[in-house]
Amino acid sequence: VNVGCVPKKVMWNTAVHSEFIHDHVDYGFQNCKSKFNWHVIKEKRDAYVSRLNNIYQNNLTKSHIEVIHGYATFRDGPQPTAEVNGKKFTAPHILIATGGVPTVPHENQIPGASLGITSDGFFQLEDLPSRSVIVGAGYIAVEIAGILSALGSKTSLMIRHDKVLRSFDSLISSNCTEELENAGGVEVLTVKKFSQVKEVKKTSSGLELHVVTALPGRKPTVTTIPDVDCLLWAIGRDPNSKGLNLNKLGIQTDDKGHILVDEFQNTNVKGVYAVGDVCGKALLTPVAIAAGRKLAHRLFEGKEDSRLDYDNIPTVVFSHPPIGTVGLTEDEAVHKYGKDNVKIYSTAFTPMYHAVTTRKTKCVMKMVCANKEEKVVGIHMQGIGCDEMLQGFAVAVKMGATKADFDNRVAIHPTSSEELVTLR
């Protein structure tokens, strides 16, 4: 709520407004130039977050739940014990839901790395940076680069390989990279491929970045990016498990510190559970909420088999345009079912919104089907409205719908979503 999906969506909505302003003239509106005021949206965004926090606090109070502010750490004892502010607490059930934290390079890896900020720091910016450099190729990097550039910050996205979102389906990875590069026509955005920041220095005019670019088959080159107002690391997230003294209870973790749990969110210590990003699986707020709810049903309502099914969890990337994806990628489906048992349906088109606009974005869609019955095991799309249209299609995938089920629906015309029920 504070530094995650809620304020991010507010900023994405703001960036979308900026994009639409560029299209107003094409739709017949004159004199639509408008100066963006960062302070106005920051104040409104922060007030919205504050209202939500008050609502959550009121709900906790009404439910007679005591909130203790502080940092918990586990202590030795005959039963699992947590200490907060010098006071010890124990209970038959202890849940660890501490989430994750942004990864920041060590100073011995990249001198001056601490001069940069993370996605948490993005929400503390008091002004729109004039010059921004985002390091990373995941969804957080893509989203923040899109927001800043759309709002007028000259932005560079630094990626180590040739594409962003490389864990997504190849269609999405390629198209999103292409859309980012094409965005330079409206926003001020460049994608620097095969590039890494090697050193950061503070100067009188901002930050100075020393960048190494190593294109395949070519000798690495070193360049300097001066006058950077905002260097943002979006290179991954670490589990927020340091300082918990998990070893005091013998709670098992992986090499990165993620807490190991079974399908019912149990750790290896009886009465201690973990959900959410601290477990390192499906790092999404709704996943943590759903897993916590299922755990509560099991522990307090006697539903012994209550657990979250982690298959076919839908997710959206608030890029420009947005991405929606659920299920297996094409490569994952081939690995699971075999190449001969996988059939792909795909399409690419220009959304009707752009029929009269100079600015263009594409909409791409892919349906991954498996076996003779052509069960739909994956849907991947990027385009205007894909963020909102995914939820319903995700229900169909979860229910085991086939390609024939999609074909038997009457299309809603004219929409982009109709393409998924008319694929050939």
From Swiss-Prot:
One of its Pfam families is Pyr_redox_2
Task: State the Gene Ontology terms under molecular function.
Answer: flavin adenine dinucleotide binding; glutathione binding; glutathione-disulfide reductase (NADPH) activity; identical protein binding; NADP binding
Annotated residues that bind FAD are located at: K8, A72, D277, T285, H413
- Which keywords annotate this record? Cytoplasm, Disulfide bond, FAD, Flavoprotein, Mitochondrion, NADP, Oxidoreductase, Redox-active center
Gene Ontology CC, one term: cytosol
Which residues participate in glutathione binding?
A: Y56, R293
Tell whether Mitochondrion is among the UniProt keywords: yes
The chemistry this enzyme catalyses reads: 2 glutathione + NADP(+) = glutathione disulfide + NADPH + H(+)
Which residues take part in binding NADP(+)? Answer: A137, I140, E143, R160, R166, G236, L283, V316
Specify the domain of life of the species encoding this protein.
Eukaryota
Which cofactors are reported in the record for this sequence? FAD
GO BP annotation list: cell redox homeostasis; cellular response to oxidative stress; glutathione metabolic process; response to activity; response to cadmium ion; response to ethanol; response to iron(III) ion; response to ischemia
- Tagged with keyword Transport: no
Main subcellular location: mitochondrion
Membrane-spanning ranges: none
Enzyme kind, highest EC tier: oxidoreductase
Q: What is its EC number?
A: 1.8.1.7
Catalytic residues identified in the record: H413 (proton acceptor)
**Annotated compartments:** Mitochondrion; Cytoplasm
Cofactor: how and how many bound: Binds 1 FAD per subunit.
Quaternary structure?
Homodimer; disulfide-linked.
List other remarks: The active site is a redox-active disulfide bond.
**Role of this protein:** Catalyzes the reduction of glutathione disulfide (GSSG) to reduced glutathione (GSH). Constitutes the major mechanism to maintain a high GSH:GSSG ratio in the cytosol.
In which family does this protein belong, per the annotation?
Answer: Belongs to the class-I pyridine nucleotide-disulfide oxidoreductase family.
Q: What is this protein called?
A: Glutathione reductase
- Give the organism the record lists: Rattus norvegicus
Designated gene of the protein: Gsr
